[in-house]
Amino acid sequence: MSVKPEKPVWMSQEDYDRQYGTVGDGENKTAIVEKTTITTQSSSNVVVGEASKTSSDIGANKIQKRKRHDDFALEEKKRRERERRLREEQLKEHEIKLTAEKITNVNNLVREHYNERTYIANRTKRNQSPIIKLRNFNNAIKFMLIDKFTHTGDVVLELGCGKGGDLRKYGAAGISQFIGIDISNASIQEAHKRYQSMKNLDFQAILITGDCFGESLGVAVEPFPECRFPCDVVSTQFCLHYAFETEEKARRALLNVSKSLKVGGRFFGTIPDSEFLRYKLNKIGKDVQEPKWGNQIYSIKFSNNDYHENGNEFPSPYGQMYTFWLEDAIDNVPEYVVPFETLRSLADEYGMELILQMPFNQFFVQEIPKWVNRFSPKMREGLTRSDGKYGVEGIEKEPAAYLYTVFAFKKVREHVE
């Protein structure tokens, strides 16, 4: 008799029972309890929200400051909404080329987006972001993932390194060299500035503009002979989905990873959870031609109904495009489903063996007890929910805890082309 898998926290009990059968009386029903948080060890960790009441002795200047702050916040919200609508209109003009004719260079669209986001981010303060708790949660996930698979003295290659947001995390792991490659030249420039401004980073950083997935890495790294290949670690955070535009790009991405790693090296990262995407699509009626879901801070939209028309299966493991919008971060950029079994199969073909795959919420619950006292007080505060537990809540929970999964592979043999 087959063993039923544990119910994902984002799946309703009704859907689980329909797919796997009703839970028996003798089974442990605690599996259905939501596990995205863990209670802090003392009541002192509880963060109380700002007091909403105003006492009679608050000065007029404080009231004026609050009003100015509220006015500014309202204007910022309106500005972001205008930018989002403009981006949606621009994207609609490209959808036919992106989906049917496939002649638009998605790399250019992604590059332009992240160049633009870099300039916008330089003008805004991170702690004013409407998704600050989501950012904190994602950072915690990366801290724990990097620490788990990175060792002292390692040479690290990060594909899609962005603005170098993980440099300090790798510094804490004690690496000796960091090679970062990203398609956005503006992001690489910002990563250079970040590295130069950071103190006590005892490792060499080589930051390169290049295409990690569309061509051989040799094209990008050839002018940098100081890069110490093969590496101990290859990491890709929130970007591998771009490689699944075509089978050719996905294979090139995995070949780049394999050729860059020494035997025994680790390849790890974060990607959208294909099972969660399938779950959400299954919840939408089959007559909906452009399936879409989300909330006030994020949305995902498929431009066709191929999934339902193909019997609730993607017609191909490659090229299954959707557009993703995340408030203050992603502006309706094309992304691609990464069927995890396809990723695992490709990795195996290129000499890498799966050692970990786990949704964010489960990974967080598993690892956070080891990290409660290792995180800084500021980090712990940023992870504390309104109920005194560590995690993420409200409208930020779905795009943070449920949408993504962590993975890790180990290179066990050389790939022979």
Swiss-Prot record:
It catalyses: a 5'-end (5'-triphosphoguanosine)-ribonucleoside in mRNA + S-adenosyl-L-methionine = a 5'-end (N(7)-methyl 5'-triphosphoguanosine)-ribonucleoside in mRNA + S-adenosyl-L-homocysteine. One of its GO terms (cellular component) is P-TEFb-cap methyltransferase complex. The record marks 163, 169, 194, 241, 335, 404 as: mRNA cap binding. The keyword Manganese does not apply. PROSITE patterns: RNA_CAP0_MT. InterPro entries: mRNA_G-N7_MeTrfase_dom (IPR004971), mRNA_G-N7_MeTrfase_euk (IPR016899), RG7MT1 (IPR039753), SAM-dependent_MTases_sf (IPR029063). It is found in: Nucleus. GO terms for molecular function: mRNA 5'-cap (guanine-N7-)-methyltransferase activity; RNA binding. The keyword Nucleus applies. It comes from the Eukaryota. Belongs to the class I-like SAM-binding methyltransferase superfamily. mRNA cap 0 methyltransferase family. Responsible for methylating the 5'-cap structure of mRNAs. This is mRNA cap guanine-N(7) methyltransferase. It comes from Candida glabrata (strain ATCC 2001 / BCRC 20586 / JCM 3761 / NBRC 0622 / NRRL Y-65 / CBS 138) (Yeast). The lineage of its organism: Eukaryota, Fungi, Dikarya, Ascomycota, Saccharomycotina.
